[in-house]
């Protein structure tokens, strides 16, 4: 019996695990954006109190975790109190000319919740150790609009 428990402990320590950050208490950031080519009110500058949750799968590190939560929150928090704009939006230059260029995050695509999730997944994957095999991000823009993996 003891050897079976020992083998089970070894497989847990060496197998992949998933870390859930923000599942019950999301990471909250406030950010502005606009959808430049939208026909409705979303083309105007506005903001949201985003709620973000992250799932990270990977091997346990020597420290006994998949990743340090502080690394994840630092990447996400980099967008807190920033304005997200699509590359080519004239507001990018307006922010820079006003001396607020550091307040802008320029994305290659429109700053929708879906795009935000994909970009944050890439940024996290780049910032995390090679022991990480998968990163998924869910972004809630409003209680009625949440984007994440299938």
UniProtKB/Swiss-Prot annotation:
It catalyses: 7,8-dihydroneopterin 3'-triphosphate + H2O = 6-carboxy-5,6,7,8-tetrahydropterin + triphosphate + acetaldehyde + 2 H(+). Pathway: Purine metabolism; 7-cyano-7-deazaguanine biosynthesis. It is an enzyme of class 4 (lyase). The active site is at residues 42, 81, 141. Binds 1 zinc ion per subunit. Residues 1-15 have a biased composition (Polar residues). Keywords: Lyase, Metal-binding, Plasmid, Zinc. Its cofactor is Zn(2+). Gene3D superfamilies: 6-pyruvoyl tetrahydropterin synthase/QueD. GO terms for molecular function: 6-carboxytetrahydropterin synthase activity; metal ion binding. Residues 1-22 are annotated as: Disordered. InterPro entries: 6-PTP_synth/QueD (IPR007115), 6-PTP_synth/QueD_sf (IPR038418). Its EC number is 4.1.2.50. Zn(2+) binds at residues 33, 46, 48. Catalyzes the conversion of 7,8-dihydroneopterin triphosphate (H2NTP) to 6-carboxy-5,6,7,8-tetrahydropterin (CPH4) and acetaldehyde. The active site is at the interface between 2 subunits. The proton acceptor Cys is on one subunit, and the charge relay system is on the other subunit. Belongs to the PTPS family. QueD subfamily. This is Probable 6-carboxy-5,6,7,8-tetrahydropterin synthase. The lineage of its organism: Archaea, Methanobacteriati, Methanobacteriota, Stenosarchaea group, Halobacteria. The gene is queD.
